[in-house]
Amino acid sequence: MNFKKKCEELNIDLPGEGEYAVGMMFLPRESDEDLECEGIFETILREEGLKLLGWRDVEVDRNAIGEIAKGSEPLIKQVFIDKESYTTEEFERKLFIVRKKAEIAVRNSTMHNKGYFYIPSLSSRTIIYKGLLLARQIGSFYKDLSDKDFKSALSLIHQR
């Protein structure tokens, strides 16, 4: 995926490959709870000494999914985080800590729709596109996956 190109459109200045992390974030759709979750996440990010680069709405095609999936579909965003001077191992460890702290903070909040908050992936190495989808639906649901600039060393689809 050419995130550099996508992020330039949003005025997000991404560093070189491997120098930033991408987080896939599932957020509540109702009211302003998505912004509340983002705020919690950003606070924890700062507390852990990490730098937020920006947020991106993940483009999806809701016509590619069934009615049950539509009824429980979260708001899906990507967050970009600068690696700065951390080693890859230090960075990945910090990202893991941020993810766990954010999950706990949202779970302990008073938000009504906190169950929608989920972080499928937060890493400088791996991005997980996940959903209540059949294998044949994932490529058409997530527009990133059908983008001509999308490149991956490995793609794996798991279906229950």
Residue spans for each PLM region:
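N-terminal segments that mediate ammonia production and transfer
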Residues: M1-R160
